Amino acid sequence: MMFTGFPEATIQFFLDIRFHNNIAYFEENRARYERDVKAPFEAFIQELAPAMLSIDPQMELRPYRCMARLRRDVRFTKDKSPFRDHLWVLFRHAGEPREGSVMYWFELAPSGMNWGVGTWGENRQMMDILRRRIVADPDAVSYTHLRAHETGR
């Protein structure tokens, strides 16, 4: 499937699951999820695959490894809502644990979209490297921030 954008039905599904956040509702609407959410996200991952491989040939590109699950782990939270009302995609080295890995991410929610690059959790070694690079070339960091602010990217 070629990526042609996220249809309005994707956001509508997120809104609907937000207000009908239960297993019965999801099962009744599983086909909508597959068509309006899962398929466009998988196409998005496939569309970005060549660019991600050009950045890092070891990038994980299998959709089931890159895409967040809609079903939440509610074991250790007060909010027992079983489903998310948004989804995200993470690109990182294949086989690396999420914690401490550098990753590219994209998130889509009813409130908008967000993307970036960063790490999950604390990684002292990586932060030390980043700090040294900022100190060595602060203009590069300032330019990147200014450019992102001016262009909205």
Name each region found by the language model.
Residues 1-27:
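Short, charged, low-complexity amphipathic alpha-helix
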Residues 24-43, 136:
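A non-catalytic, amphipathic alpha-helix used as a structural packing/dimerization or gating element
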Residues 39-44, 48, 126, 130, ...:
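Active-site-proximal binding-pocket segments
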Residues 34, 38-79:
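Gly/Pro-rich turn-and-neighbor structural signature
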